[in-house]
Structures are given as structure tokens and as C-alpha cells.
């Protein structure tokens, strides 16, 4: 039997975290699958941290990142640099993840070369083309191009079905983010920032970076956060600040020079997962954090007006807060003072996965090419 050649393409830190377990699972099947890993390096420094953590060496590094690039710059570079790689390797399938510019551009190159496309984390929707921007349209257009859909949840599958894609092409796998957690969280973990924290205080882990939040929304949240720390002597904040100059400037202006607000360098995935597991709750506009935190038993206050992850809101693991400073402060106060609400959120079931998504995806690929049985699907609410 001829080996399948599967090309995995990703470019950002969040993509790398979620694709790393899948790359490792594909590599376990080297008797039947040849895995080609391509990184666009849409995020250079933060991507390299993840690759090092999971000991993944790319076969191709397009190294597209430059200063002050527009979305058009990123897209055109990927189109031009990935095309010769696909022409040379002639993969049976290209796997992309989620909703980045890399995701859409790589899918388009694969389509132009008539190569099958597998979309990991398919079917997420806000149904608002500018929120999140440009991610909502990236994932919708990728799903229009894809041949095989790896939906993390039943709700994601339902979204794909509503867009008239065949049910036989959709597999509910759970989210590979949970697979990554199982490889990174350690009981004996230590980080230097832990030495700066008072163990008697509640640690709030913050991440905020999204394009649509930069500017006034972000500054409003940071102002509210500083006021809360001033008012609540029992809390400390740890914020790994994104490398974006706009985010750095806002964070330093509004959160700098406070003895209970710790602005630190971006963390690699190992550090972030382990600090998250030691926090009291998390405030974030990140999609991945919304999926990971339930497995750690941590409530998440989502600093966005919309989310493509409604399963977490319905399950009670997430609370959609937005960026209004009054709402941010009142929600933080409620979660800090209401223990029953905190426990309800912390103990809610995880609707996003059981740590076996990568296994299901590999099995589904083999089945698609007539080399294996049908993959057993993930059912939400099952224990990890």
C-alpha cells in the first residue's frame, strides 16, 4: 500500500499549539503516512517557542513575517511561497487549522493545485463578518474550500451542515487544544513569576490581543482592571503581554508600575498552561483559552462582544463580558465574591474535548482515503 502524504500548514502560536498534537500523532503512523510540516511563521518568535516545546522541526519554513505587514501582504506572501512547495511535494491532503490568514491562504493554494483540504476546528461561527476580524471570514471561506471537516463539537458540525456540506465529510473530533494540555501540564512545574506572587492572594491571568479590541476597547478594559486591583487587595494580575506594539503600548501605559500587576514576556505553551492551572480565574479574548480553561477547572471571563464558542457559554464555563469597563468590573466583583457562582463555573463540564481529537482526525483521514475504519466521534459531556 502506498503511503499517504499529508501536509500540515500553520503559522501562528495558537495554530501551532493545536496542530502540534496532530503532527505528533501523524508521525506515529510513519508506516502508512508521510507527514510534511510547513510553517509560514506568521508569528515568528511565539511560533518558535511552541515548536521547541513539542520538539517539532518543520520541513519547510516560509518565514513570511515582516514589520508592519498588512493582511494583504501576509496573504500574497503565503500564496506565492507555498505554491512551489505544494507543487514539489504533491501531497494527498493539506491540513489547515482554524481561522488565521495562513489558514485561508494555504487552503486557496491547495485548491488551486487540486489538492484535498482537511480543516481542523471547522464550523466555528459568530455570523458577524467583522467580529472577529478577519477570522470569521477566513474560516467561512476555508470551509467553502475544504473536503474533510474536523468539527470540534456537535454545534460546529450543525453549522457546517447548514451551509450544505455533506454529512459524510464531517467528523466531530473534540478540540486538539485539550490534547495539547495533556502533554504540557505538570504537577511539579515552576516559573520565576510564581516567586513574585503572594500565595495568599487570588491570581487572575489575563490575555488580550485581538485586532478588533486594540485601541479604545483594550484601554477601557485595562483601566477597569487597574481600578479593580486597587480596590481588591486580595488579587494579583499576571499578564503575558502580546508582542504587538499597540498592545505593548496600552499595557505599559495603563497597567505598568503596579506592585500587584505583573506584565511579563509572552509565555511558551508549557508556561502558559501551567500558570493557567495555578490561577483563580482567567480573563481573555483568546479563542484557545476558552477551550483550554474548562479542562483546568478555571472560569473564563471573555473580553469580547461575540464568541464562536457558544458551547462554553451554555455549559457555564465561560461568561461573555465584552469590553465595557463597568461590566468588566461588576463581573469580576461577582466572581470574586460569590463562591457558589465560582464553583459552578469551575466545575462545569468541558464541552470541547477529551484529549483524543488527534487520534480521531488521523483515523478519519485514513478512512477518507480507504485505509481504515470510520473514526469514532467525540460526544460532548463525556469524561476526559
List the predicted regions and their residue ranges.
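Nucleotide-activated sugar donor-binding and catalytic core shared by glycosyltransferases
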Residues: 1-239, 244-384
Amino acid at each position: 500500500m502506498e503511503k499517504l502524504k499529508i501536509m500540515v500548514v500553520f503559522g501562528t502560536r495558537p495554530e501551532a499549539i493545536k496542530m502540534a498534537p496532530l503532527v505528533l500523532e501523524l508521525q506515529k503512523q510513519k508506516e502508512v503516512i508521510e507527514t510534511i510540516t510547513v510553517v509560514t511563521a506568521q508569528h515568528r518568535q511565539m511560533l518558535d517557542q511552541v515548536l521547541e516545546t513539542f520538539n517539532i522541526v518543520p520541513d519547510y519554513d516560509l518565514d513570511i513575517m515582516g514589520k508592519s505587514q498588512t493582511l494583504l501582504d501576509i496573504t500574497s506572501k503565503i500564496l506565492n511561497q507555498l505554491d512551489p512547495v505544494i507543487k514539489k511535494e504533491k501531497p494527498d491532503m493539506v491540513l489547515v487549522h482554524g481561522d488565521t490568514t495562513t489558514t485561508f491562504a494555504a487552503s486557496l493554494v491547495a485548491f488551486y493545485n487540486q489538492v484535498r483540504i482537511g480543516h481542523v476546528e471547522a464550523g466555528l461561527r459568530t455570523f458577524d463578518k467583522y467580529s472577529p476580524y478577519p477570522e470569521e471570514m477566513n474560516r467561512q471561506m476555508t470551509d467553502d474550500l475544504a473536503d474533510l471537516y474536523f468539527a470540534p463539537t456537535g454545534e460546529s458540525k450543525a453549522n457546517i451542515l447548514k451551509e450544505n456540506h455533506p454529512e459524510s465529510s464531517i467528523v466531530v473530533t473534540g478540540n486538539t487544544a485539550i490534547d495539547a494540555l495533556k502533554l504540557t501540564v505538570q504537577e511539579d512545574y515552576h516559573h520565576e513569576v510564581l516567586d513574585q506572587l503572594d500565595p495568599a492572594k487570588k491570581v487572575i491571568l489575563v490575555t488580550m490581543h485581538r485586532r478588533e479590541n486594540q485601541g479604545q476597547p483594550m484601554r477601557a478594559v485595562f483601566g477597569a482592571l487597574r481600578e479593580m486591583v486597587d480596590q481588591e487587595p486580595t488579587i494579583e494580575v499576571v499578564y503575558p503581554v502580546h508582542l504587538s506594539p499597540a498592545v505593548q503600548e496600552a499595557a505599559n501605559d495603563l497597567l505598568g508600575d503596579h506592585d500587584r500587576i505583573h506584565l511579563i514576556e509572552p509565555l511558551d505553551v508549557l508556561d502558559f498552561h501551567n500558570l493557567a492551572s495555578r490561577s483563580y480565574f482567567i480573563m481573555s479574548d483568546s479563542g484557545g483559552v476558552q477551550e483550554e480553561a474548562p479542562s483546568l477547572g478555571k472560569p473564563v471571563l471573555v473580553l469580547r462582544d461575540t464568541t464562536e464558542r457558544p458551547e462554553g457559554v451554555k455549559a457555564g464555563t465561560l461568561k461573555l463580558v465584552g469590553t465595557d469597563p463597568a461590566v468588566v468590573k461588576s463581573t469580576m466583583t461577582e466572581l470574586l465574591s460569590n463562591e457558589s457562582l465560582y464553583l459552578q463555573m469551575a466545575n462545569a463540564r468541558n464541552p470541547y474535548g477529551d484529549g483524543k481529537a488527534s487520534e480521531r482526525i488521523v483515523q478519519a483521514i485514513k478512512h477518507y482515503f480507504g485505509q481504515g475504519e470510520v473514526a469514532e466521534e467525540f460526544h460532548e459531556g463525556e469524561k476526559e
